[in-house]
Amino acid sequence: LLLDTRKTTPNMRIFEKYSVRVGGGYNHRYNLSDAIMLKDNHIDAAGSITEAIKLAREYSPFIKKIEIEVEDLKGVEEAVKAGADIIMLDNMDIETTKEAIKIINKKAIIECSGNVDINNINRFKGLEIDYISSGAITHSAKILDLSLKNLRYVDDWKRRERKENTWDTKR
């Protein structure tokens, strides 16, 4: 499944996330309260992946899934041992991703992320992953070129219609 990210245009998130769903994609998180996602800053503050996951479990409702972003195989191993629900493989090449999949061995949901766009998404084809997340589907979407020139035509048409439907008292 293809997921968007929170990387959206200010004040346009609701529309951009809706467009992802209409286009067949899925929303990752609408805001920070939707799920717990531990990134490098959280890991650094906690001291380790294991400690970050432990603290997240301790201070969050049991129903919330804990996702952790990892950048190497050592991080994957630690995340699996610590019991992460979702492991995001960030910016990993395909060979490293294949090794990570073996290490995870269905013990967690696998999400691949990092510079994923329309030109390179096929690299994940055939891999046993659950999700691919891409900020490009919102922050790099092509803008539809709209013109207001047609409004002039509509205004002319409405004026003509009014003239034809007006009773002329001089006749």
What is the predicted role of each segment?
Residues 136-157:
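Short, charged, intrinsically disordered terminal tails
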Residues 158-170:
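Short, low-complexity, charge-dense intrinsically disordered segments
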Residues 1-82, 86, 98-103, 109-112, ...:
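Acidic/glycine-rich phosphate/pyrophosphate-binding loops and surrounding catalytic core
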